[in-house]
Amino acid sequence: EKHAALILGQGLASLGDRFEIGGFSSNGHENCHYFIYKDFEQEWDRQSITRVLAATPAESTRIGPALRHSGYRLERIEARQRLIIVVTDGKPMDSGYDPNSRYAQHDIRMANEENARLDIHTFGISTEANTVADMEIMFPRRRFAILPDIRKLPRILPQLYIRLTV
């Protein structure tokens, strides 16, 4: 994912598009963290690249709050289009989620619907850990891709961005 973020960041910077690269982790609903590696106002420079490269996986994957926070930040940005691309290598899971329920998937869907009301659109990219049925709940209207090989992400992500924004 880091390599893909670096490639996309370089491409967006060369296009002159404003962008943010963030990450998130959680340990229960009261302990959600959102990390900013490159914010909208920062230049894409050596420091931004270093922060992306220093990112490490941590704790659990409570995606709904991260989407809401991304939407909150993006809502304040003047842009012709506002897009959130979520890249995940696993199912949404956290303490407090019943693994037999689809609560996490429905929370992501609700966060996407909340952002859509603000004219912010989301696209999800996942490994095969999520099924088509899971992804259709989280990212309705086929606004998702499932990659059988995450190593293809650096090649696919720039093409996807162009498709979503043109």
Label for each model-derived stretch:
Residues 1-166:
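Acidic, glycine-rich A-domain
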